Amino acid sequence: MSIVSLLGIKVLNNPAKFTDPYEFEITFECLEPLKNDLEWKLTYVGSSRSLEHDQELDSILVGPVPVGVNKFVFTADPPSAELIPASELVSVTVILLSCSYDGREFVRVGYYVNNEYDSEELRENPPQKVQVDHIVRNILAEKPRVTRFNIVWDNENEADIYPPEQPGVDEEDEAEEEEEEEEEEEEEEEAEDEEEEVEVDVDGEVDLENEDDKTDKIIDGEEAEDDDDGEEIGDEEDEDDEDDEEGDAQTETAAPNDKTTDTEKEVRLHDRDEDEKADSSKKLKTENDTAKEPDTAPTPQDSTN
């Protein structure tokens, strides 16, 4: 933003002779106090083909500039005819009124200037040598061309006041800011969810009593569920105790069976031993009988007799 704004320029002596000075009434506004002066300058364009013929007619320093609207008259000397090509003395040219601050131009106003002879006879039959005394100028003040430029004013070095960039710290700050934003969003979402759960009356008032009743019911329901859970847990504990008692009873009943089984095994072994003894006695008797048979059987000699 420009601190100085050009509000208007008024050309005072127009038309005028070529040799008359230029006079401008300039009005501008200053928004902030300035440390330096404003430099106003008027330039005459001597030739459209080259910048070598441009002439700086005059310059003026205005200051100190107070804050607010300011007005002054800028007077500049006419151009030197000797520095202008003869073929362009009587023609259309341009003058430039510019303003700079601290060597930096921020506004420029251009005007077309028509230079011609003051008599119809000279206009129809121009002399071979230009007669400067008979040349008049007419500035087209109604059609100025204004150009503005952005410059740095007195706050040019404000950037040095700020601390230097610290990449690591800056990244941490950004991360913290992002976390804070996320937390805020989550809190907003939770708040919205809570608002949706609350019932609103027709008039837009919240039915707090119903909410309390609901809360009590919910609490009672939770306590009832807790009681049911406690009963179930107690039943399960009773069942576990019964299962343990049944297991102990089965163990006790199984013990006599084990004893009976051992006794049966001993009886069976005793019977088996008795059977084996009986078998062995039978075998002994058979062997004895077999040994006695030769004594009773007749001999071959007896059979022949």
Curated annotation (Swiss-Prot):
One Pfam family, short name: ASF1_hist_chap
Subcellular localization: Nucleus
Similarity-based family: Belongs to the ASF1 family.
Protein's UniProt keywords contain rRNA-binding: no
Region (Disordered): 157-305
Keyword Transcription: yes
GO molecular function: acetyltransferase activator activity; histone binding
Chief localisation class: nucleus
Quaternary assembly: Interacts with histone H3 and histone H4.
Top-level taxon in the UniProt lineage: Eukaryota
Gene label: ASF1
Regions annotated as coiled coil: 168-206
Keywords per UniProt: Chaperone, Chromatin regulator, Coiled coil, Nucleus, Transcription, Transcription regulation
Name of the protein this chain belongs to: Histone chaperone ASF1
GO cellular component: chromosome, telomeric region; cytosol; H3 histone acetyltransferase complex; nucleus
The species this protein was found in: Candida glabrata (strain ATCC 2001 / BCRC 20586 / JCM 3761 / NBRC 0622 / NRRL Y-65 / CBS 138)
GO terms for biological process, alphabetical: cellular response to stress; DNA replication-dependent chromatin assembly; nucleosome assembly; nucleosome disassembly; positive regulation of transcription elongation by RNA polymerase II; protein modification process; silent mating-type cassette heterochromatin formation; subtelomeric heterochromatin formation
InterPro entries assigned: ASF1-like, ASF1-like_sf, Hist_deposition_Asf1
Record's compositionally biased regions (Basic and acidic residues): 259-272, 278-295
Function of the protein: Histone chaperone that facilitates histone deposition and histone exchange and removal during nucleosome assembly and disassembly.
Feature: compositional bias, Acidic residues: 168-213, 221-249
